Amino acid sequence: YTSCADVGGCPMAAAVLHRIDRMLSERPEIRNKVTLMSVSFDPERDTPARMAEIKQAMQPKTDWHFLTSRTAADLQPVLDDFHQSIAKLWQEDGTWSGLFRHVLKVFLLDTDHNVRNIYSLGFFNPQLVFNDIETLLIEQNQQATRSP
């Protein structure tokens, strides 16, 4: 996450999430109903301490978690659940290049942890995501008022 060399990938996603964080912070009626999570595929470099540094640098205004795992094996069940594949890129001499190949996916989950939308590179726009968050919250409020 923190070592991604593709400026149109993880760094762009972080910038969009940062903008969403700011948009949420301007809406006190919904900011405490949303949690943002950034998850690293690279536990070797993205240690808990490194992720804490990134969080401090981003200065989130909302509930935004920067997550990593102990090992790649620990992360694999989560990746499998979300159908997210990643692969280390190897150099010709057999050493790891330090890079990963993956499709950028950002997931919008509802309060029951159901995937409600998946944003890819071309559709990860802060206003679009914010509108989808508002739509989910409206839907949840309507369901809550209908429940006995």
Task: Name every feature range the model reports, one short phrase each.
Residues 1-16:
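Conserved redox-active cysteine motifs that mediate thiol-disulfide chemistry
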Residues 7, 45-48, 123-127:
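Loop/helix-junction capping segments adjacent to catalytic residues or to phosphate/diphosphate-binding pockets
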Residues 80, 84-148:
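Thiol-/selenol-based redox modules, centered on thioredoxin-like
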